[in-house]
Amino acid sequence: MKILVIGGTGFIGPPVVGELQRLGHRVAVFHRGKSTASLPPDIEHIIGDRQQIAEAQQNFEAFAPDVVVDMILSSGPQAEALMHAFHGVTRRIVAISSIDVYRACGVTHGIEPGPLEPLPLTEESALSNYNKSSGFIGGV
């Protein structure tokens, strides 16, 4: 399969990219080109900014991924831009989320009110107010 990984140069990305390649997939990574991440030498690179993802649409079409794995999706507007950028390009998008969807992240960073959440966080933990109000969670 041809798999495009968005944000594959961070903490989790390189092991994911390496494992996908080890399993025999052709992998491309969409990133800003600013990371010194250790990626396998024959990985394809599509350089661009996540905030202007539509600008790379021709490159996405040229790679023609069977699956897109988004490692850095963090908001409703980003999800909408992702869906538009890949409409007609791929039939499958996998969104990898993070602790940012939970209220605990906002409380810890001082941007959401409330007490600290008990650990460990689970899928039953309270969601961030932004993600609840934007319809991002459960709406994509």
Predicted regions: what they are:
Residues M1-G10, A79, N129-S133:
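Short, charged N-terminal helix-start/capping segments
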Residues M1-K2, H31, R91:
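Secondary-structure boundary/capping motif
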Residues I3-H25:
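N-terminal Rossmann NAD(P)H-binding glycine-rich loop of SDR-like oxidoreductase domains
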Residues G8, R32, S98:
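Cofactor-binding loop segments of dinucleotide-utilizing enzymes, especially the Rossmann-like FAD-
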Residues A28:
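Conserved beta-strand positions in the Rossmann-like core of class I SAM-dependent methyltransferases
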Residues S35-A95, V101-T108:
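NAD(P)H-binding glycine-rich loop region in Rossmannoid oxidoreductase-like domains
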Residues E80-V140:
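Conserved Rossmann-fold NAD(P)-dependent oxidoreductase catalytic core, especially the SDR/UDP-sugar
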